[in-house]
From Swiss-Prot:
Keywords: Carbohydrate metabolism, Glycoprotein, Glycosidase, Hydrolase, Polysaccharide degradation, Secreted, Signal. GO terms for biological process: arabinan catabolic process; arabinose metabolic process; L-arabinose metabolic process. One of its GO terms (cellular component) is extracellular region. GO terms for molecular function: alpha-L-arabinofuranosidase activity. Alpha-L-arabinofuranosidase involved in the degradation of arabinoxylan, a major component of plant hemicellulose. Acts only on small linear 1,5-alpha-linked L-arabinofuranosyl oligosaccharides. SMART domains: Alpha-L-AF_C (SM00813). This is Probable alpha-L-arabinofuranosidase A. Residues 1-25 form the signal peptide. It is an enzyme of class 3 (hydrolase). It catalyses: Hydrolysis of terminal non-reducing alpha-L-arabinofuranoside residues in alpha-L-arabinosides. It is found in: Secreted. Its main location: secreted. Pathway: Glycan metabolism; L-arabinan degradation.
């Protein structure tokens, strides 16, 4: 991310909107001769934990502050129930990594249920699946523990279980329970754990590291939340860049994302202060990212820390001999990912349940090193990391974190890519339609982050059409632009640090906001060719823009109408007789989808061709995809 956005509304958008629309026409003829090859991994995802996109978002664990991690965790999200009090206890750590537990002090003479609740990440989404709950208990106890999922305002019970359990005051005991649930109508649900007050009056119990999971995406242990994962899977993306982004860098070298603290049992993961204002549990760790890639068929793009923190934080940039420990750390990480089970770190991975090495072909060195004082040292740092990685893993593709020549070696290593980020206004994205037409083809581009940023809390129709125009320009040049990702990807509506985002959600299990930009990304990603074809036209680009591709015997023509007038479109593709037309449109350029309204969704229609000619209307402010066969 380039900078923190605080923009929140659409009121300042300088739109001109006419109730009277003119009708114009564009005729296109698609060549069936073989054209330029198109990147097979052009569309994909950039992910970092921002807007609670990880914890509280796609990561399936539902309880907030569940491990009381960090130096001063407090009791955020927790509340006592009955004749009892709760406190953060540093005298009874669960593990070295989880140095606090939740102490339940029960009053002498207590009666009824005593315990505590957790409100989750502004609610607990109960989707009707069987939930898995684990926690640890320490203290002299023998009896029943009741766990419920209960409406915060209504008291309605959406799931419960009773656990017969004993524990002692010497060691923590792990407890596992399954909770059958019924779907809640909203996210206003609490997790509640209670015991009988009369049986523990005048004593205390300690609890540690609570986990609550619904049935996860692909039933993966410690996996993803289906509510958020499925819309991503529906996009049929090709790659995932992780773990960031700013959230890779940290505020200092000590607060960087440390791969080795995100692996293994979660009780051995300390978490870290993230770079977007909240603590990260790191339950979604290195292996979980690779499982995510595996389960969605995504090519992993692993970002590695490169001696530079945000705004030159801590002692960074780190150069010279001081870089060696960090280079070694990256090599250890790569051995963990790629080494067989006979290697030191490959055997560690195998001990955590993954015997086979992960599939990894691309590594990005750093993040946005052209910013915050990183440029001057990046030539040295990039070269040091690149040389070491290439020597150990010569088949890996290395990606530089910037395309700015002043920050890069005069000659990039053979096969290296550059990463370019572009947050811009709608009009400027359209002006950049031809940005890559004359780029040097010897240096492949990864557009690692882009989107329309224009005082908009939500993606809106004009901005999404502008993104489509930009994407058409990218696809026309997908021999040199190899990958491109909208950013940011995900947003929990209740806790947002950046707007707009591609997909938003609340803790209502039925509420996922698929934005206008989401639909554009989906339309372009699921309709992909491997060859770009020449198109002849009776008019120049603007306000209608287009690109044509094919795969096997199917042709795809993608169009964007960046204007307030209707366009009559004729597309001729020799030998094609039919197809499907998908259109996303709204005559109001300000139209947007949000948590309170869904105004814009794609429409589909079957198409018939006469002598290879398709005729259809492209409305004002619209994006269309013709899939012809």
């Amino acid at each position: 991310m380039v900078a923190l956005s605080t923009l929140s509304g659409l009121s300042a958008l300088p739109f001109l909107f006419s109730l009277v629309q003119n009708v114009y026409g564009v005729s296109l003829e698609v060549s069936t001769e073989k054209g330029n090859s198109s990147s097979p991994i052009l569309y994909g995802f950039m992910f970092e934990d921002i807007n609670h996109s990880g914890d509280g978002g796609i990561y399936g664990q539902l309880l907030r502050n569940n491990g009381l991690q960090g130096s001063k965790p407090g009791l955020t999200a927790w509340a006592a129930v009955g004749d009892a009090t709760i406190a953060v206890d540093a005298q009874n750590p669960l593990t070295e990594a989880i140095p606090h537990s939740l102490k339940l002090d029960v009053k002498q003479g207590a009666s009824g249920a005593v315990g505590f609740t957790n409100e989750g990440y502004w609610g607990v989404p109960v989707d009707g699946s069987e939930f898995l709950n684990t926690f640890w208990i320490k203290g002299n106890f023998s009896g029943d523990i009741t766990v419920r999922l209960v409406g915060n305002n209504t008291g309605t019970e959406y799931g419960s279980t009773k656990i017969s359990q004993s524990s002692n005051s010497s060691n923590f005991t792990k407890v596992l329970a399954k909770i059958p649930t019924k779907k809640a109508p909203d996210g206003a649900v609490l997790y509640e754990l209670t015991v009988d007050g009369a049986s523990v009056g005048g004593s205390s119990l300690n609890f540690g590291l609570f986990e609550l999971f619904p049935q996860t995406y692909k039933s993966r242990s410690n996996g993803l939340k289906p509510q958020v994962a499925q819309p991503l899977a529906d996009m049929k993306g090709s790659f995932l860049r992780f773990p960031g982004g700013n959230n890779l860098e940290g505020a200092s070298e000590a607060r960087r994302w440390k791969w080795n603290e995100t692996i293994g049992p979660v009780e051995n993961r300390p978490g870290r202060q993230g770079d977007w204002s909240y603590y990260n549990t790191d339950g979604l760790g290195l292996d979980e990212y690779f499982y995510w890639c595996e389960d969605m068929g995504l090519t992993p793009v692993l970002g590695v820390w490169a001696g530079f923190a945000l705004e030159s934080g801590g002692n960074t940039p780190i150069t010279g001999d001081a870089l060696k420990p960090y280079i070694d750390d990256v090599l250890n990480e790569l051995e963990y990912v790629l080494g067989d089970a006979s290697t030191k770190y490959g055997s560690l991975r195998a001990s955590y349940g993954r015997k086979e090495p992960w599939k990894l072909t691309m590594v990005e060195i750093g993040n946005e090193d052209m910013l915050g004082g990183g440029c001057e040292s990046y030539v040295e740092r990039f070269t040091a990391f690149s040389d070491a990685i290439h020597a150990a893993y010569p088949d890996l593709t290395i990606i530089a974190s910037t395309d700015q020549s002043s920050c890069l070696p005069s000659k990039l290593p053979e096969g290296a890519w550059v990463d370019y980020h572009n947050y811009n206004t709608a009009d400027n994205l359209v002006k950049q339609f031809s940005q890559f037409d004359n780029k040097d083809r010897s240096v492949p581009y990864f557009i690692g982050e882009y989107s329309c940023q224009q005082d908009n809390a939500w993606p809106f129709m004009q901005g999404s059409v502008a993104e489509a125009v930009y994407m058409i320009g990218i696809e026309r040049n997908s021999d040199v632009v190899k990958m491109a990702a909208y950013a940011p990807l995900l947003q929990l509506v209740n806790s947002t640090q950046w707007t707009p985002n591609l997909i938003a959600f609340t803790q209502n299990p039925s509420t996922v906001i698929e934005t206008t930009s989401y639909y554009v990304q989906q339309m372009f990603s699921v309709n992909r060719g491997d060859t770009i074809h020449n198109v002849t036209s009776d008019s120049a680009f603007g306000p209608v823009y287009w690109v044509a591709s094919s795969a096997d015997d199917k042709y795809y023509v993608k169009l964007a109408n960046y204007g307030a007038d209707t366009q009559e479109i004729t597309v001729t593709i020799s030998g094609k007789t039919g197809g499907k037309l998908t259109v996303l449109a709204d005559s109001d350029p300000k139209a947007f989808n949000s948590d309170t309204q869904t105004l814009v969704t794609p429409s589909e229609s079957d198409m018939k061709a006469t002598n290879g000619k398709f005729t259809f209307t492209l409305p004002a402010w619209s994006v269309g995809v013709l899939a012809a066969h």
